């Protein structure tokens, strides 16, 4: 009857609102899209730092910080590798967790060593990158990644 239809509509609306406000679990596709967006955003941002270092290599190679005692030039090359090559793999989700290790290591060195005694405002960017990269490392690359497609292809060949 009319009252039952109204109750059904009200219950449906309340159910939608409840699920929106209190989701029981994240939707796989939505979560993977979020991870993809974060990979692209933070990968491109970190890559821009590597491009800047690469473009100014001649100027920076003699004076780049050497916190590991391996020389300014090698420290710069490793920073460029972490910020450019690994960022590219991170964006595409290729060897995702392996690529993230140098990125996380670079941000640890930047935050704890290079800017260790600086005020937080100076090292805040390295901290943000570090936290985001650790969280994304834990989350994994999502299903919109080369790793996901490679894993699917390898799994289908096992059968």
Regions found by a protein language model. Name each.
Residues 10-55, 73-81, 85-88, 92-159:
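Extended, low-polarity transmembrane helix blocks
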Residues 1-11:
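Single conserved hydrophobic/aromatic residue that forms the stacking wall/gate
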């Amino acid at each position: 009857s009319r009252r039952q239809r109204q109750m059904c509509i009200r219950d449906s609306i309340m159910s939608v609102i409840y699920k929106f406000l209190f989701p029981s679990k994240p939707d796989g596709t939505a979560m993977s899209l979020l991870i993809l967006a974060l990979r692209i955003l933070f990968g491109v941002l970190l890559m821009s730092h590597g491009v800047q270092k690469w473009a100014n290599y001649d100027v920076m190679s003699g004076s780049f910080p050497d916190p590991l005692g391996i020389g300014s030039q090698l420290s710069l090359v490793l920073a460029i590798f972490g910020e450019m090559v690994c960022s590219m793999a991170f964006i595409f989700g290729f060897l995702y967790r392996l690529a993230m290790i140098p990125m996380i290591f670079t941000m640890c060195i930047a935050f704890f060593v290079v800017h260790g005694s600086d005020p937080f405002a100076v090292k805040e960017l390295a901290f943000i990158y570090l936290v985001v990269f650790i969280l994304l490392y834990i989350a994994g690359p999502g299903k919109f990644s080369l790793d996901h497609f490679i894993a699917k292809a390898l799994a289908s060949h096992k059968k």
